[in-house]
Amino acid sequence: MGLGGVLEDWRRDPSRTLRLEQDYARSLPFSLRPYGHWLSHAREFGELKVGLWTVPGSPSVALVSWKAFPGMGTRVSHLFVDSPAPSPTLLSDILAVLSEREGPVFALTDLLAGLSPEEVRPLLQEMGYVHFEHVDTVFPSGKPLPPVPTTGHWSFRSIAPSDEAVLVEISCRAYAGYEEQLMWPTLDLRRDLMDYVRDSLSGGEEKLILGASLLAFAGEVPVGYILSSLPSNGNPYVASVQVDPAFQGQGVGRALLLQVLSELRALYPAQDVGLTYVRQNVRGRALYDSVGFEPLPAEQRRTVGSWLSRKALVSLPQSSVKPGWGENGE
């Protein structure tokens, strides 16, 4: 029993759970429906716990999924509220019950379907969460490409499966203190990055575009890389841009990105190129803006951001989020 409702295992009412999962997926923008459908898969294979939140005497119901991490707390992956009069207090009630049952909620999705973002934002900020918004962008197919810089001592070559260890090492240095690792599968930075790189190189969920996935060198030293993929919608996508922190700010990231865009333009001349970044990534945002990437409108949103607990963030080594830090890093 919670402050305003009851959280029960989905097995108590499987038919209602299935209906809500279907309604949840249909409520999302078309580009995000795969994220909604993933909930059913994760529930069936036991990857997430799933519950129904009901309020006695009320038609309101919420579908919620989460994962508990011993010694760390709870992460909420999905939330869908089906209510004639949705209230953000329903969210605070659910988080309170989950915190009591599984441990403090240190992270939750920002895709809180059925709730007003304008009402949820001040509530979560007051509860001590910081919003990490994803900015989905495209480089339009008809837009002229800036020239690849000829200054600098960088060289590039196509990435090969044998580069796995090199990519993991660059990633671990580049992602040290990265806040949204709290949304990654295992919360083990090296393990999660190793799994991601291995899956990308093996052509896992999305096809890797080898001709536009490049490794950058300063002399013989690998200093950065970009992975480009071809999602199911057929539009090329810059999936990962990583530069060793020791070489950041020297122009290698810009040169590498422009070289990749040049390769993608040659391979897919009539298609836009997608790229997503976290709004707090000020340096990345400046680079992508200067190159010519343009934000997509909200209704074409393709990725899901997060709300992360300040208490969890300040425990991350080298995290840029400190007590008193503003929501957008200011």
Label each PLM-derived region with a short phrase.
Residues 113-133, 254, 279-297:
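Conserved active-site alpha-helix within GNAT-family acetyltransferase domains
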Residues 36-98, 102, 218, 226-236:
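Conserved donor-binding loop and adjoining core beta-sheet/short helix segment
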Residues 85-100, 243, 249-263, 286-290:
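Conserved acetyl-CoA-binding loop-helix of GNAT-fold acetyltransferases
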Residues 107-119, 245, 274-285, 302-306, ...:
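Conserved beta-strand-loop-alpha-helix junction that forms the acyl-donor binding cleft
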